[in-house]
């Protein structure tokens, strides 16, 4: 999309675990002899945004494993594994049931199962306080787990206070979370993969990740659609479009106040509010 320059975040769904060390890099050579086989994969707990430990038991496990689970982020081996047992920990970033597959070093599927994370009784909500009022956003971890976890990481690290809405287009979007009033950019976390095409649409009041032209480039910046923007929806999931991860459930009138502020060109950027609209607080309220 040419009308905006987007910024934004990247998680990896597949973790390669080479033999004898839990490396996340794939092995350059294929081990000889028998490949691994699995008897059991046992998680200790499955709680949204908590760490879970997976204990894998079987045979020849040091020959190399590839574990694939979309909702299990930052897979790390715990301790020193053996040929009959390896233990890994990861952060569960999705809710509901996700598929878990394990492949041997020859790429054969040696285990297929599921991990089910109970849906929280109350969906996550974030309250954003600005110089023009407060906005409550409800997030959708079942539809956009990577984007939601990324956004909450920024919220919990107190990243957003003193950033501004730096792009305001009254018949399009309000975009913020990436610049200070001096139009400097705070240091962000790593970029995330694009979760467009997740079933959530860029309609009025929806909240989505901003990004650069390339798909997997979102970091901290987000935007709120002030009108229905079907042109921002994906035609090729994960390749184009913009990933919606939540919606405004309270304070849409404040969004309308923000979209109406006068703007100008500043620091080489267009559509910057003449008087900064500053995010003064961002906290998880549910």
Where are these regions (language model features)?
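Bacterial N-terminal signal peptides that target proteins for export
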Residues: 1-8
């Amino acid at each position: 999309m040419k009308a905006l320059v987007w910024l934004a975040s990247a998680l990896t769904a597949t973790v390669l675990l080479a033999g004898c060390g839990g490396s996340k890099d794939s092995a350059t050579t294929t081990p000889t002899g028998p490949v691994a086989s699995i008897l059991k994969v046992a998680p200790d707990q499955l709680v949204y945004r908590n760490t879970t430990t997976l204990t894998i038991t079987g045979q020849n496990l040091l020959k190399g494993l590839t574990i694939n689970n979309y909702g299990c982020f930052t897979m790390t081996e715990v301790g020193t594994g053996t040929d009959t047992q390896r233990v890994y920990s990861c952060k569960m970033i999705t809710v509901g049931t996700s598929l878990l597959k394990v492949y041997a070093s020859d790429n054969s599927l040696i285990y297929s199962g599921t991990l089910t994370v109970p849906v929280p009784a109350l969906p996550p909500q974030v309250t954003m306080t600005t110089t023009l009022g407060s906005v409550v956003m409800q997030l959708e971890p079942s539809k956009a787990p990577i984007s939601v976890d990324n956004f909450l990481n920024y919220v919990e690290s107190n990243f957003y206070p003193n950033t501004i809405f730096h792009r305001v287009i009254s018949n399009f979007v309000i975009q913020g979370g990436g610049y200070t009033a001096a139009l400097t950019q705070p240091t962000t976390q790593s970029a995330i993969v694009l979760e467009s095409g997740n079933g959530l649409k860029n309609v009025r009041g929806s909240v989505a990740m901003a990004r650069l032209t390339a798909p997997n480039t979102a970091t901290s910046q987000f935007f709120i659609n002030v009108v229905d923007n079907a042109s921002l929806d994906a035609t090729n999931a994960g390749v184009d479009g913009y990933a919606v991860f939540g919606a405004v459930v309270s304070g849409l009138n404040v969004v309308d106040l923000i979209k109406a502020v006068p703007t100008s060109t500043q620091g080489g950027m267009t559509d910057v509010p003449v008087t900064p609209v500053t995010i003064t607080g961002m906290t998880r309220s549910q």
